[in-house]
Amino acid sequence: MVAQGEVRSGSMTQIAASDDSKRSAKWQERREAIVDTSARVFARNGYHATGIAELCEVNGFGKGAFYYYIGSKEELLAAIHDRVMDEVMLGADRVAEAGGSPSAQLAMLGEELLDVIHRYPDHVWVFLHEFPALTAERADQFRERRREYERRVEAVLRDGIATGEFRDIDPWLTARAWLGMHNYTYLWLKAGGDVSARDAAKPFADIFLHGIARPTGGAPA
C-alpha cells in the first residue's frame, strides 16, 4: 500500500488532455465510449494492426470528429491503460480503508483485481499486451502507476512478515507471483461466463495464503 501522505502519480492521459476538466459532461461521456469501443478493437486486432480509419468507422465518427475527442492513436492507448489502472487503484484504496489483517487485505486485493479483469477483459488484454507501444513520458507514467500498485501489494506482504503471519518470503518476488496468478485470468475469466470474479477470488486466496503462511506454532519453514 502507499504510505500516508504519498502523492499518487496522475493518469497518463492528463499529458495530452490536461484541459479535460473544462470539457462538458457529454464530451467526457463520448470520449469514454470511444475508449471502450476501441479497446475491443485493439484486443481483437492488435494495436499496430488497427488504423485510424477503422477506429473512426467502429465509433461512427469522421476523422475530424474522432480527433476532437482523441488527440492521437497513442493517446487512445494511454486512456485504455488509465482505465485499468484507475479501477485497480480505486480497489486498492477500498482495501486500505477497510483495513484488517495482512491475510484479509491480500485476499481483498485479489478480489478487487479479479473484479476489474472480469469487468474490463478487453482493456486488460490491451494493458498486458500493448504497453510497449507507449513512448516517452506516457511510458514512464505507466511504469510508475504500475509500480505504485506493486508497492501496495509488497507492503501488505511486508506487514504480514513483520507480524509473523507470513513466512520470511521475498516481498518483491512474492508480489510478482501473486500478480501473475491473478493477471492472466483474463484468458478465461469472462463476463457472463461460468466462473465469476468472486468465485475465483476465494480459492485463489486460499491457495496463495496457505503457501506463504507461517506454519502453526511459528516454526520457520
Segments predicted by a language model, with ranges:
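Amphipathic alpha-helical segments used for helix-helix packing
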Residues: Q105, I117-E137, L187
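C-terminal peripheral helix-coil segments that are non-catalytic and often amphipathic
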Residues: M1-S18, E112-D115, R119, E150-A162, ...
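Helix-turn-helix
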Residues: A33, T37, V41-E75, A79
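Amphipathic, non-transmembrane alpha-helical scaffold segments
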Residues: W27, V35, L77, H81, ...
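Hydrophobic alpha-helical connector segments
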Residues: A79, D93-D122, T174-W178, A201
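Short, hydrophobic secondary-structure boundary micro-motifs
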Residues: W125-L128, I169, A219-A221
